[in-house]
């Protein structure tokens, strides 16, 4: 059935009947004549087929637009499949709840770097999104009376932080992402959406500041495909593989943020990288926060539930940045576990076996395979592990990509949209709450579709491509395919990952970051000395990994340079040399009588990061955080204050 679906999706009858012999084939490379170019025209093109990409594609196709989905792997292998814990929505099935409480918790969780109009939109629409998923057939776990089961998750409260722990996270045991991805993909097949599976996106096609399409390579036969479209959605996921230890799949290489960079668009807030508290020690595999939501807790070598000291109210369900830092402090102060005292234990064996089997079957299996642990009898060795990128391509709350200048403020990039982990909407700010990521996918995937449908009629003639469209992409592809330097791709990638792991970790310091920046500059220069060995065009994994390394390098450079420049601690960005959050006001004192600092004198602002791909040079700018909500009558903004759990 899957093979048949794949054939229907990408074996278009005219696929090899088209060819192109214009300027694209005149690039100054040695073997350019080898590259056959196929042209397509669509109303909309979606790059990526995870949760955000599939939800965008469904909305576009349902609205009658001729839609293409370009994905470098089969849709159900997208990294959304690895999400475990759940999706947040204030259904109120376990206790009274209100989306405004969810709004408050998300703003607080972001350490007041989130844009409150986008957070308003996401949390208000969350209940509708979950009901929509249920209608699509997503098999949520149930309570005894048949309602959707909701578990406790970190950083979430009732009554604006005054009413104790909220149970807001809708789940499918501990395999929620797997269920969501299969549900969305299955539902998408009822629409007339064309999938280009195992196609690698090389570059956006830009013309006079507008995005008019995408250049991609078919991994199966090496043909180059130019997708001409008035609308392009980036939904390519994060770049966790820029680090040595992460919960991300090997395919999480920051392709979308790299595409934006090469198109001259600045990415936002790349310095904010979330370390999940509970990756399996030594393997990096994710152990869901839902394990603590179900009653698990962390212990040190003394057997202490140490989170009671760091977050007296929320304890083990404080926000992820707080828990990861607490674990790191315990290890640094000699209270870690194991022979090297370099990790922490997650205890679940006090929970009933029935609860482990029904609510946490996936992590029980994962712990057995990757840690050799029977969770019903012994604790799981865990350590903070790179998990999520809060930064990405900057957008407004409708998914439209923004280009910011101080003179003009936020300006739309015509024809370009982004959703999911590839985007910075910014609903997560400096730190994402657990289970807001799956919500982000469906909310902003849908928002992109709604925005496009407002501005595009089915069958509308797409814009013409510039004469040299794809020329630089093919030139770079050919250069990497015939790279004959002395550094194998895997070797340079490993050096980059270890540099990022060492110099941009849970705790950061100016001298360590500065050293990391210099190391990364040297590694970036080494891209010119790469060596590839496979010269073929058919299933050339050596070539694709090299192109992915180019993308990772862009993301890594932007992350570490922005981190070195941000001289404060906020959310996931914690600096030993600047331990305090630096806002426009001192919120530890009464606001009355205080004068707001200008934007150059505080750090409650979004970074905008431009990079020159040829040299690697990074340029930084900053834009204000949006504090206004969409409708003050629905909910007012949450003023910043000292953040504690």
UniProtKB/Swiss-Prot annotation:
Expression by tissue: Not expressed in adults (at protein level). Expressed at very low level in adults (at protein level).
Protein's pathway: Carbohydrate metabolism; tricarboxylic acid cycle; fumarate from succinate (eukaryal route): step 1/1
GO biological process: mitochondrial electron transport, succinate to ubiquinone; tricarboxylic acid cycle
Binding-site list for FAD: 49, 52, 71-72, 78, 80, 84-86, 201, 255, 421, 432, 437-438
Reactions catalysed according to its record: a ubiquinone + succinate = a ubiquinol + fumarate
Binding site for succinate: 85, 276, 288-289, 387, 432, 435
Functional summary from the UniProt entry: Flavoprotein (Fp) subunit of the mitochondrial electron transport chain complex II which, together with the iron-sulfur protein (Ip) subunit forms the catalytic core of the complex. During the free-living larvae stages, which occur in an aerobic environment, complex II acts as a succinate dehydrogenase by transferring electrons from succinate to ubiquinone.
Name by which UniProt lists this protein: Succinate dehydrogenase [ubiquinone] flavoprotein subunit 2, mitochondrial
Transit peptide location on this chain: 1-25
Enzyme class, broadest EC rank: oxidoreductase
Tele-8alpha-FAD histidine carried by residues: 79
Keyword field: Electron transport, FAD, Flavoprotein, Membrane, Mitochondrion, Mitochondrion inner membrane, Oxidoreductase, Transit peptide, Transport, Tricarboxylic acid cycle, Ubiquinone
GO cellular component: mitochondrial inner membrane
Keyword Flavoprotein: yes
Gene this chain is encoded by: SDHA2
Family to which this protein belongs: Belongs to the FAD-dependent oxidoreductase 2 family. FRD/SDH subfamily.
Active site per database record: 320 (proton acceptor)
Co-factor requirement: FAD
UniProt entry tagged with the keyword Mitochondrion: yes
Subcellular location: Mitochondrion inner membrane
Subunit comment: Component of the mitochondrial electron transport chain complex II composed of four subunits: a flavoprotein (Fp), an iron-sulfur protein (Ip), and a large cytochrome b (CybL) subunit and a small cytochrome b (CybS) subunit. There are 2 developmental stage-specific forms of complex II which have the Ip and CybL subunits in common. Complex II from the free-living larvae (aerobic environment) acts as a succinate dehydrogenase and is composed of the common subunit Ip and CybL and the stage specific subunits FpL and CybSL.
Biological source species: Ascaris suum
UniProt cofactor note: Binds 1 FAD covalently per subunit.
A GO MF label: succinate dehydrogenase (quinone) activity
Pfam family, one: Succ_DH_flav_C
Range of residues in the leader sequence: none
EC number: 1.3.5.1
Its membrane topology: Peripheral membrane protein
């Amino acid at each position: 059935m899957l093979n048949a679906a794949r054939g229907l999706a990408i074996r278009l009858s005219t696929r090899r009947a088209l060819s192109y012999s214009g300027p694209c084939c005149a690039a100054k490379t040695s073997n350019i004549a080898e590259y056959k170019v196929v042209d397509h025209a669509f109303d909309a093109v979606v790059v990526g087929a995870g949760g955000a990409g599939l939800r965008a594609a469904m909305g576009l196709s349902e609205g009658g637009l001729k839609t293409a989905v370009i994905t470098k792997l089969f849709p159900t292998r997208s990294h959304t499949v690895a999400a475990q814990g759940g999706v947040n929505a204030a259904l109120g099935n376990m206790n009274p709840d209100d989306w405004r409480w969810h709004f408050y918790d998300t703003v607080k969780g972001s350490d007041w770097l989130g844009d409150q109009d986008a957070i308003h939109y996401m949390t208000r629409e969350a209940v509708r999104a979950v009901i929509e998923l249920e209608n699509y057939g997503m098999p949520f776990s149930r309570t005894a009376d048949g309602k959707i089961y909701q578990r406790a998750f970190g950083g979430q409260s009732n009554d604006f932080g005054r009413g104790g722990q909220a149970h807001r996270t809708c789940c499918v045991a501990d395999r929620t992402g797997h269920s969501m991805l299969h549900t969305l993909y299955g539902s998408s097949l009822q629409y007339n959406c064309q999938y280009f599976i195992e196609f690698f996106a090389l570059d956006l096609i830009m013309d006079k500041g507008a995005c008019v399409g995408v250049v991609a390579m078919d991994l199966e036969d090496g043909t180059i495909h130019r997708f001409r479209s008035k609308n392009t959605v980036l939904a390519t996921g994060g770049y966790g593989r820029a680090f040595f230890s992460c919960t991300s799949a090997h395919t999480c290489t920051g392709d979308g943020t790299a595409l934006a960079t090469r198109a001259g668009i600045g990415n936002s807030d790349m310095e904010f990288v979330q370390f999940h508290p509970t990756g399996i020690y030594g393997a990096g595999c994710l152990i869901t926060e839902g394990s603590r939501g179900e009653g698990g807790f962390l212990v040190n070598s003394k057997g202490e539930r140490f989170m009671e000291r760091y977050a007296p109210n929320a304890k083990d369900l404080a926000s992820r940045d707080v828990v990861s830092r607490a674990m790191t402090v315990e290890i640094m102060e000699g209270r870690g576990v194991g022979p090297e005292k370099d990790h922490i234990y997650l205890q679940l064996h006090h929970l009933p076996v029935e609860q482990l089997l029904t609510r946490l079957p996936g992590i029980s299996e994962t712990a057995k395979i990757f840690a050799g642990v029977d969770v019903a009898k012994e604790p799981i060795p865990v350590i903070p592990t790179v998990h999520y990128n809060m930064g990405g391509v900057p957008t407004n709350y409708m998914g439209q990509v923004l280009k910011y200048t101080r003179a003009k403020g936020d300006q739309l990039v015509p024809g370009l949209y982004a959703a999911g982990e590839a985007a910075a909407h910014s609903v997560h700010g400096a730190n994402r709450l657990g289970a807001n990521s799956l919500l982000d996918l469906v909310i902003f995937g849908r928002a992109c579709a709604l925005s496009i449908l407002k501005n595009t009629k089915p069958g509308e003639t797409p814009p013409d491509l510039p004469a040299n469209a794809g020329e630089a992409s093919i030139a770079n592809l050919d250069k990497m395919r015939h790279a004959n330097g002395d550094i194998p791709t895997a070797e340079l990638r490993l050096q980059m990952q270890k540099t990022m792991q060492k110099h941009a970790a849970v705790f950061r310091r100016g001298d360590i970051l500065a050293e990391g920046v210099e190391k990364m500059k040297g590694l970036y220069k080494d891209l010119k000395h790469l060596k590839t060995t496979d010269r073929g065009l058919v299933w050339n994994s050596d070539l694709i990994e090299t192109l992915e390394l180019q993308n990772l390098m862009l993301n890594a450079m932007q992350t570490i340079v922005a981190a070195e420049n941000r001289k404060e601690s906020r959310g996931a960005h914690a600096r030993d040399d600047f331990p305090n959050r630096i806002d426009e006001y001192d919120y530890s004192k009464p606001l009355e009588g205080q004068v707001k600092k200008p934007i150059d004198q505080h750090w409650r602002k979004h970074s905008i990061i431009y990079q020159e791909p040829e040299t690697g040079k990074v340029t930084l700018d900053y834009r204000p955080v949006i504090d206004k909500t969409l409708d003050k009558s629905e909910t007012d903004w949450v003023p910043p204050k000292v953040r504690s759990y």
